[in-house]
């Protein structure tokens, strides 16, 4: 395939057009008065969303040059979403502003490499400042406030997430499911989560969220490595006859065995997903036994004289629901094994009392928390399928934001933190050389963009709102819902520090890469062959 190569100004301009198209579609969603975006679906009803990363994933531009720019911007959103679970729209707005300002300076003759260094140094300074201004999350009220803001000012969601954290603890497992009713409700069930994901991405059932989800599944729990097809076939046949999904937890699944599971899953013969067993050595065996007890199954191991090909259905565990992502597996059970779980927890507590090792103590406490903590399930209800999907996305965002807040603390929300921190840039800039100072200036201007857009979406003049907030000190900001200038902490308008930090770092990273781009190589569209003339009819 022939390639098309563009250089310097022309290359950057083409990328910028793609960046702007994607950013303009996303930035209308920011703030309490942000608008929705409708996504056309090839099959089924269109999806109405208010979530930056979901919109970014849907956008594919016809022009390959512009599409390359859009993909760069998509990277900002998805990277921020992966790290912090929220703040994707803020990251996109910051990146677009840095790119626009940077391009102006490069056109005027600035050195792109020095600009990038200036942007990186200023961002590192701001990250330190964000950490310095962050307040630790204390009490249920703050958790509810963080969740409410992230869910688009839905206080019912905020209250529910605070309740869920009360039920299972701050480090507990909280999952979001679709409800059959109109109501959104909270349920605390028996279950466990461990840090291992699917072995192959071909196991996913939802390619948008990259997760494998099944209900009423069998679990094959083994400490062996599975590579031979002969070992696996009898089990697969038994499970397939039942018409239920299968989760395989093993030391490893490879070769013919893995290929068979993937092929059966893709052909729809048997819904299966394989994950590696958590932990290592003796601790791995103990955790597999915990999972077996929780799900009412048996640990299949040659140590206890059970071979894989002799496994029957009553030796397998059962889960009400399983959710597997690329790095986590969540198992939710129906509570029928409660007595056995309590017995197991008591046994681990006895071990805890007799151990002298600090490391062993920590790991035993971790096992108790996993077994006894349970899983809080938020069941999302709505009147229509479209509303249900939007509400579920908002709740997942709010949950991620709340976890991020617990981790690194909170800062004033609504774009106020970034704006107030920009006041320190002129003094910091003095430490940089003349060329790097231009990079610092680019970041300075970009920090005004999120609040400008929040005000703009609320139907106000962004630059006026920015000026008024700059006149006041941290933690004052603009409440776009009421149109007033308030103390953001007192009003409960807060953002997790981790979300603000990740948004800024990812925006600066992509902007720096873009500004130092000197050439772009894309595929050249092949000319379509001219249509042949129609055959002449018979006389």
Curated annotation (Swiss-Prot):
Keyword terms, alphabetized: ATP-binding, Chaperone, Cytoplasm, Isomerase, Nucleotide-binding
Localisation per UniProt entry: Cytoplasm
N-terminal signal peptide: none
InterPro entries: Chaperonin_Cpn60_CS, Cpn60/GroEL, Cpn60/GroEL/TCP-1, GroEL-like_apical_dom_sf, GROEL-like_equatorial_sf, TCP-1-like_intermed_sf
One GO cellular component term: cytoplasm
Alphabetized GO MF terms: ATP binding; ATP-dependent protein folding chaperone; isomerase activity; unfolded protein binding
Tree of life domain: Bacteria
Biological process (GO), any one: protein refolding
Residues the record lists as binding ATP: 29-32, 86-90, 414, 479-481, 495
Reaction catalysis annotation: ATP + H2O + a folded polypeptide = ADP + phosphate + an unfolded polypeptide
Class in the EC hierarchy, top level: isomerase
Documented EC number(s): 5.6.1.7
Subunit structure: Forms a cylinder of 14 subunits composed of two heptameric rings stacked back-to-back. Interacts with the co-chaperonin GroES.
Role: Together with its co-chaperonin GroES, plays an essential role in assisting protein folding. The GroEL-GroES system forms a nano-cage that allows encapsulation of the non-native substrate proteins and provides a physical environment optimized to promote and accelerate protein folding.
Family per similarity comment: Belongs to the chaperonin (HSP60) family.
Protein known as: Chaperonin GroEL 2
Organism, as annotated: Synechococcus sp. (strain JA-2-3B'a(2-13)) (Cyanobacteria bacterium Yellowstone B-Prime)
């Amino acid at each position: 395939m022939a390639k098309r190569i563009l250089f310097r100004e022309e290359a950057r301009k083409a990328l910028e057009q793609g960046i702007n198209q994607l950013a303009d579609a996303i930035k209308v969603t920011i703030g309490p008065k942000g608008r929705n975006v409708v996504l056309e679906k090839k099959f089924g009803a269109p999806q109405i969303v208010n979530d930056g990363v979901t919109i970014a994933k849907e956008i594919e531009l016809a022009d390959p040059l512009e599409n390359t720019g859009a993909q760069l911007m998509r990277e900002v959103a998805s990277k921020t979403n992966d790290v912090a679970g929220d703040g994707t729209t803020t990251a996109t707005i910051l990146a677009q502003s840095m790119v626009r300002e940077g391009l102006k300076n490069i056109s005027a003759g600035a050195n792109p490499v020095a600009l990038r260094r200036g942007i990186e140094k200023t961002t590192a300074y701001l990250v330190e400042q964000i950490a310095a201004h962050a307040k630790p999350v204390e009490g249920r009220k703050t958790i509810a406030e963080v969740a409410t803001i992230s869910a688009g000012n839905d206080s019912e969601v905020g209250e529910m997430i605070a309740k869920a954290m009360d039920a299972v603890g701050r480090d507990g497992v909280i999952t979001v499911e679709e409800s059959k009713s109109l109501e959104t409700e909270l349920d605390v069930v028996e279950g466990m989560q461990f840090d291992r994901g699917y072995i192959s991405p071909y196991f996913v059932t939802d390619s948008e969220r990259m997760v494998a989800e099944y209900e009423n599944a069998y679990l094959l729990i083994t400490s062996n490595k599975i590579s031979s097809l002969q070992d696996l076939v009898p089990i697969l046949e038994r499970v397939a006859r039942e018409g239920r999904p299968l989760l395989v937890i093993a030391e490893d699944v490879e070769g013919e065995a893995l290929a068979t599971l993937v092929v059966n899953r893709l052909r729809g013969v048997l819904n299966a997903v394989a994950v590696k067993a958590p932990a290592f050595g003796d601790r791995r065996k103990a955790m597999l036994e915990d999972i077996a007890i929780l799900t009412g199954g048996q640990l299949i191991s040659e140590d206890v004289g059970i071979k894989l090909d002799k496994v029957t259905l009553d030796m397998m565990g059962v889960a009400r629901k399983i959710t597997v992502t690329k790095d986590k597996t969540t198992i939710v059970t129906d509570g029928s094994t409660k007595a056995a779980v309590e017995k197991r927890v008591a046994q681990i507590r006895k071990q805890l009392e007799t151990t002298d090792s600090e490391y062993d103590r920590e790991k035993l406490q971790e096992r108790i928390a996993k077994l006894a903590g349970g899983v809080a399930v938020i069941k999302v209800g709505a009147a229509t399928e479209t509303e249900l999907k939007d509400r579920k996305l908002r709740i997942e965002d709010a949950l991620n934001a709340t976890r991020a807040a617990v981790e690194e603390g909170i800062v004033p929300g609504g774009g106020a933190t970034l704006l107030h921190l920009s006041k320190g840039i002129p003094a910091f800039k003095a430490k940089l050389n003349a060329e790097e100072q231009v990079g610092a200036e680019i970041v300075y201007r970009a920090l005004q963009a999120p609040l400008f857009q929040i005000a703009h979406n609320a139907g106000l003049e962004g630059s006026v709102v920015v000026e008024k907030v700059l006149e006041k000190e941290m933690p004052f900001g603009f409440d776009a819902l009421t149109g007033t200038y308030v103390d953001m902490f007192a009003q409960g308008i807060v953002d997790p520090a981790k979300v603000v930090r990740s948004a800024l770092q990812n925006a600066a990273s992509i902007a720096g890469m873009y500004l130092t781009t000197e050439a772009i190589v894309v595929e050249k569209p092949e000319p379509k062959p001219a249509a042949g003339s129609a055959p002449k009819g018979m006389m």
